[in-house]
Design a protein with these regions (language model features):
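Helix-breaking motifs and short loop linkers at transmembrane-helix boundaries and internal kinks
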Residues: 35, 67, 88-93, 297-299
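Residue-level signature of mid-helix packing/kink "hotspots" within the transmembrane helices
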Residues: 21, 49-57, 107, 140-141, ...
Length: 388
């Protein structure tokens, strides 16, 4: 395993995640300031995910054919353009357009995961994917806190900061990331099988198929949480007599990032060696289910933070373990295709979950919103036996 490309991709993912997490706690409040209801906020998040669904698989296939680095650069430049559009938005349609632009080019993390698969061995892959978990942890620690601080002065400042980070990510990829040889499919010269045929084959695989459904269940639960949490917290919690706003939500996300960084900081490799990836998937789903259940009944900040600990720990061990299991099962020349399929499943979950979350929160069904996340964790848990 080469350390220099892994360090470079870690740095790039970190900068990308910082931009994402700066936007995350702000976007619902930014949209509300332009007249959006919770249901419309859900539609906004879903529109971004729908564009990812359209663009994700082709980007994965393209990265298999031409290499990860060129596709990563195009994705990052699209994100930069989307953030600039968002910062200049003065009406809801401009916010939607900005998120659509970003969504259509949002292959950053997909291609980064494929790059990690290219430069690691199966034995070290889970630990290497844990680096993405560390990047997410650090991003959630720094980004939301910075967003909450900057939003006190103007809702535009955090978005401009995210745009600057996106431009930095482009420069890091161009100057720091070594190119790796593409992995075109062996059928290229004789005619490639269709994308849908490859997807169907993946779902028919006795072990890979259930793992893909587990990934969908995890992503649905995760999307339920992060698409609706800001609006949920605004209606459920107060600080100094005022409802939660971008600052408070940003600090809660930062707390989540701290827990995630503590769990991922060198710990995922030892946990995999001790318990195995399958066991960590089981623990992850269980921990997240408990966290959602606690969140459904919490009215005090203390219980909120306890719920966040369970949710963050669960996702921190589940995401890299399940991703490693899926990519290890896939043939080397189809790594990009399988990860593109995972991106599609993620996008489908991210289309549906925010719509449901927005409607539930608009109807003031706050506890039901949290229990929906717990339900999908239970579904993911129920699929564990079929993957053994």
């Amino acid at each position: 395993m080469k350390k220099s490309p892994l360090f470079s991709i870690f740095l790039i993912v970190l900068v990308d995640v910082l931009g994402l997490t700066i936007i995350l706690p702000l976007l619902p409040f930014y949209a509300e300031s332009l007249g959006a209801t919770p249901a419309v906020v859900g539609m906004l998040v879903s529109a971004y995910a729908a564009c990812q669904l359209i663009a994700g698989p082709p980007l994965g296939h393209l990265s298999d054919r031409v290499g990860r680095r060129p596709v990563l650069l195009v994705s990052q430049m699209g994100t930069f353009a989307g953030f600039l559009m968002l910062a200049s938005a003065r009406a809801l349609w401009m916010v939607f357009l900005a998120r659509i632009i970003d969504g259509l080019t949002a292959g950053n993390l997909t291609v980064a995961q494929a790059y990690i698969s290219d430069v690691t061995t199966p034995e070290n892959r889970a630990k290497s994917f844990g680096m993405i978990g560390i990047a997410f942890g650090l991003g959630f620690l720094i980004g939301p806190a910075a967003s909450g601080y900057l939003a006190q002065f103007s809702h535009t400042y955090p978005i401009l900061a995210a745009a600057a980070l996106s431009l930095t990510s482009v420069l890091c990829t161009y100057f720091l990331l070594p190119a790796v040889a593409p992995h075109p499919t062996p059928e290229t010269e004789q005619g490639r099988p269709s994308r849908w045929s490859a997807y169907i084959e993946s779902f028919k695989d006795g072990k890979l198929g259930p793992m893909l459904w587990q990934f969908f269940a995890f992503t649905f639960a995760f999307s339920t949480l992060f698409s609706g949490f800001a609006l949920f917290a605004e209606r459920r919690f107060t600080h100094n007599g005022a409802p939660f706003g971008p600052k408070e939500v940003g600090y809660v996300f930062a707390f989540s990032g701290l827990i995630g960084a503590m769990n991922q900081g060198g710990g995922i490799g030892s946990l995999v060696k001790t318990f195995g990836e399958g066991k960590l998937v089981q623990v992850g789903f269980g921990s997240m289910a408990v966290g959602f259940a606690l969140l459904s009944g919490s009215h005090q900040i203390t219980f909120l933070l306890v719920a966040i600990v369970f949710l963050t720990f669960g996702s921190a061990v589940l995401r890299p373990s399940l991703t490693s299991l899926i990519t290890s099962r896939a043939a080397r020349h189809r790594q990009g295709m399988v990860i593109g399929l995972m991106q599609s499943l993620m996008s489908i979950a991210q289309i549906i979950a925010p719509l449901i979350a927005g409607l539930l929160i608009q109807k003031q069904y706050l506890s039901m919103w949290a229990l929906a996340g717990s339900l999908f964790c239970a579904i993911g848990w129920s699929l564990i036996a079929t993957t053994r």
